[in-house]
Amino acid sequence: EIEIEDESLLYKNRIKEIYKDLDPNRFKLFDALPLEEYAKFYTLFDINLAYVEHNAFASCKSEIKVIESLHYGCIPVFSEYGGYKDFWRAAPDRVKHKNMAISVQSPGPWINAIGHWVENFEDGKRRAAQLKEYSDDIYDINKHCEDRLSFYLQRTEEFNEAQMNMIAQYVD
């Protein structure tokens, strides 16, 4: 039995296995960066891969990696799963392309999607900019403050009412 102290090593080894047949000069795996340097790595590449395993944990992940990559001008290629799938379903058809959201886990469709964007780079940048415009609109906190405040106030009222009902049970 082999004991592995770092679970990220398992992930890195899985990624290396998936891409073992590709030229190592064409891609690079990045370790986590400190917060102050986090966005820096997005400026290093044109195409962002946001792959998630198809499991219960990953199904709860948000779409943040896709949104971040769009913010920095990357062409996204991501798993059509979990939060990524929710984001993709909500996006208007005019900004979608089949080589952005990949619904299968096998390497073939991912390699084809990456190859498509390498060969059609300008179209990819244009489509990524359109998707960014959509995501910037729905993720701009300033455009949704009133809705959020209304939601919190409604929940506060419901909570207060529930507390009053609970107290009333003991007062009678």
List PLM regions with ranges.
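Nucleotide-sugar-dependent
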Residues: 36-43, 48-68, 78-88
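Nucleotide-activated donor-binding/catalytic signature segment of Leloir-type glycosyltransferases, i.e.
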Residues: 3-42
